[in-house]
Amino acid sequence: MVTIWIDPPAWPAHGRLWSHLISDESIAELHDFAAGLGIPRRGFEGDHYDIPAEYYERALASGAVETTGRDLLRRLQASGLRLPKRRGDKGIERVTGWTLADGTRADIDLILSPREMTDERIFAAMVFVQDVGGRHLLTWSERRQEWGAPGGWREGDESPVANAVREAEEESGLVLDPAELRPVGYERFRRDPHTPAPGLWVPGRDILQVYAANLSAHRPPVRVEERGQPGPEWVEDVELGERCRDSFWWPLAARVLALEQPPQPE
């Protein structure tokens, strides 16, 4: 039986005290336990849940085991489930064993952050684009056979922002002002060493930088990248979810684009 651990509510934020809830064996079991308490998935921080103080006794009554904050951190680190991140960043999800278009497999950490990662680690960039009415720009990737936000690999010595701007123009014809792009998160890739071929991986370059851009125009004109392929489209929230919900990056997109409801206090 999987043990769920919790520390006493001692962490102040947003005018409340909070506990941390972890599993040292299974993230899936942790999600199930939190859902049983009525804690929204939005409370998940990539390797633990932040639990408001008013849920603490309920968690204990449901089978969580109390421990100190220090012991809880030790158990999380020893479990291999810890999602490392910089101070101020927010872990969203670890996607494990994802097969990429080049045939390689990777574990992918999705992290929310208002700061760019170190330039030399960034191998690619993407940008979530919204028009003034809140519609989302989607482009079709023939290589990946899926809809998504404009993005791709860096070329030459271009900056990550220039990378995102170029990809948006190539894939949709939309010319973005680099000043409109703001960093909102990143995807950290760890390639499965048992994958037969390294694909396009370069050691030390493991980050896809994610930006967002909010435009002041309604549905700016876009054009198809290549004849015979589906053209880019402006879509509403529901359509975005229907087309992209199965993509590995969806949990990060949902958080960046505020497509999830925030937790409601009792």
Can you say where each PLM-predicted feature lies in the sequence?
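Phosphate/adenylate-binding glycine loop and adjacent helical scaffold
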Residues: 2
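Conserved Nudix-box catalytic region and its N-terminal flanking loop in Nudix hydrolases
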Residues: 130-170
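Alpha-helical and coiled-coil interaction segments, frequently adjacent to or embedded
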Residues: 33-37, 58-61, 67, 91-101
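Charged phosphate-binding loop/patch that engages nucleotide di/tri-phosphates or the phosphate backbone
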Residues: 244-266
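Basic nucleic-acid-binding interfaces
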Residues: 17-47, 54-58, 62
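Acidic, metal-coordinating catalytic segment for phosphate/diphosphate chemistry
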Residues: 73, 80-126
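Unchanged
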Residues: 154-248
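Short, compact, well-ordered microdomains
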Residues: 46-84
